[in-house]
Amino acid sequence: MKQTLNYVTYQTFPASTANSLQSISNIKYFIKKGLNVCLYFPLREKTSSDDLKVLQEYYSFTESLEIKGINHYLPHGRIQIFKKTMFHISHFLWSRRTISKYFKKNNEEIFFTRSDWIAFFAARKKYKVIFECHQESRIRNFVIKKIGDYENVYIIFLNKDLQENYKNISNSIVLHNGVDVDLFEENLQQKRNSIVYAGNLSRFGVSRGFPEFLKKYNEEKIFQEFNLEIIGGDLDQIEDLKTVVKDLNIEDYVIFHGRKNRSETINIIQMCKIGLLLNNANNTHSYQHTSPLKYFEYIYAKLSVIAIDFPSHRSLPLNQKISYFDLDKNRSLNVAINQSKNHDELSAAELRDISLETRIKKILDFAF
């Protein structure tokens, strides 16, 4: 009889966020490894849906799973003041109610979550909990302090620096994100001279730094050799950047693809030569701990990678394949691009190691 994995999260689906994509990608490969997966999440947005076909189309997967969208009659999304406080209160109440209502005492239950309060309440009921930790926060520090030494709790940290911030943990492992290799095609036509960025243009409401990057792209005349292709972003963000592009007179060299589905995104990435990692230093997670899905997609697609010089990017696996730049330094972007041309492609073993199939196998070996 197949084991059932309860993937319980305060995220909602479908959503354009990288974290929702990461969750669905993990679920897909848990299923491919032979587990039954039941996804529980709140129907907290007007666009939220627990229709399997809707999620399959949005995220480009065919695997079947059980989905339980749970009604969300809580302040977050309904009260438009003190939004951060409303989020934390709602997250706490929803998690406590979900664990209490949908799971009766059964030691066979296994949970996978990136939700602090789901991990907390499930662990306190002695269920096996696999808790994926992506960043620090005061609530997370409290939760891990309370349950980190439980023998039934297994914690996955996205990088070593994050793991080292937490002591006295019984079971933990460092696992970066991985790539869904099913989305890639072989033997595509020759790559075009383009730098590509795939993802949201802001994080937590703060720009990732594209206006500054575009100015550097223009100042160092990168457009003479490489176009810039941007996949993703809300319409208002794209319009703002188009204004910057127009003011810099580089409209002929910057292509805005807008939002694309997973297959279309990967196809565009595969057609380019260089992948871009860009973020804002004001966010601790972006600066110290991020493990972006796009990075693994870039290198699996055999792109060179250039990245703003943050500790999080230097902590990525195979970081010797990355060329770093500093937007405050003269010709830094040009130097990084030239260095990136000399990087060797990944070996077959390296490609296997960054796959989601390998990542999920490591999770199963660690916690099952």
Question: For each predicted feature, which ranges?
Answer:
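A charged, aromatic-enriched C-terminal amphipathic alpha-helix characteristic of glycosyltransferases
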Residues: 182, 327-368
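Nucleotide-sugar-dependent
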Residues: 17-18, 204-208, 263-265, 275-297, ...
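N-terminal strand-loop element at the rim of the active site
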Residues: 9-17, 29, 36-90, 233-237
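Carbohydrate-associated surface elements
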Residues: 161, 178
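Conserved donor-binding/catalytic core segment of Leloir-type glycosyltransferases
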Residues: 6-8, 156, 169, 179, ...
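Short amphipathic alpha-helix
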Residues: 19-33, 54-57, 213, 294, ...
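Nucleotide-activated donor-binding/catalytic signature segment of Leloir-type glycosyltransferases, i.e.
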Residues: 232, 239-269
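A short alpha->beta transition loop at the rim of the catalytic pocket in nucleotide-sugar-dependent
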Residues: 273, 300-302
